[in-house]
Amino acid sequence: VTVKHLSFTYKDSKVPAVNDISFSIPRGSWTTLVGHNGSGKSTIARLLDGILLPNDNPRTVINVDGIELTEKTMWDIRDRVGIVFQNPDNQFVGATVEDDVAFGLENRQVSRSKMQTIVHDVLEQVDMLDFQKSEPQYLSGGQKQRVAIAGILAIGPKLIILDESTSMLDPAGKAKILSLIRDLQNKNGLTIFSITHDINEAVQAEQMLVLDKGKLLASGSPREIFENEVLIKSAGLELPLFYKVKNELIKKEIHIPREVNSEEKLVKYLCQLNSKM
C-alpha cells in the first residue's frame, strides 16, 4: 500500500479530518495506526477502501496491490481490501453464520459448489465450523468477530483493515483474536493494517504510524515509537506497561539489552540481574 499527500474534509467541517499524510505499508507486513479518538484513524480506513474519496489534489495517490484508486478502479480495490469493524453486528446480513460468510461470494456470482467449499474452509480457519448453522446474534463477541473475519477471508483479500475491531472484547478475547489474525496472516500472506487507540495492541506490529488531529506525527517500529516519550505524550497516548518500566529503569542507569523486548523477557532479565547481586 502506498499513500501520498492524502487529505479529506467532511462536508460539514472546515477542518481536514486527514491532512496531507503519506505512508507505505510493506506487502505481507503488520502496520498499526494509533491515535486518540477523533484523530482521523477510521477516516483513513474508509479512504483506503474507497468508501470515501479524498480531496481533489493531483498529488494524491492511493495505491493498493499495484492498483491506483480512482472512481473507475474503486471496485477492483474493494476486491483486494477487507475491513473488520468495531461492532460485528453491523456487518451481519445472513440468517445463519454460513449464510453471512457466503454473502460476499454471492455478490460475486461464485458457483454454489465453489461457495460451499470456500465457506467451509474459512470457517475452519477461524475455528467456527461447528457454528455454521447458528444465528449470529446468539454468538459471543469474540465468536462474532471470528465470523466477520471469515466473511472477509472468503473474498480473498490482499489487505485486511482492522478498524478498532477488538475494542469491544475483554483482554482474553482480544488476545485470541489478535493471535488468530497473526496466524491467518502467516498462512495466507496477508497484509494487515490495524487501526486502534489501544497501545498494547500496537506492540504486535512491525510498523507503527502515529496520528494526531489528522496529521502523521511519526512512523517507525514500535520500539522506536515507544522509546520516544515526548512523542507519545504529544499524541495523547499512554505507554504500554513494559515501556513505562523499561524507561524508568534506564533513567536509573540500569542497562536493559535490546533483546529484552517484552514483559516476560524483562521479568526474566531482572530476576537474573537480582540473583547476581
Language model features by range: what are they?
Residues 57-68, 77:
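Conserved ABC transporter NBD signature motif
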Residues 113-131:
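Conserved ABC ATPase "signature" region
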Residues 160-163:
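Catalytic Walker B motif of ABC-type/P-loop ATPase nucleotide-binding domains
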Residues 34-36:
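The feature captures the beta-strand-to-loop junction immediately N-terminal to the Walker
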Residues 135-139, 143:
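Conserved ABC ATPase signature
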Residues 49:
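Helix-to-loop junction immediately C-terminal to a conserved catalytic motif
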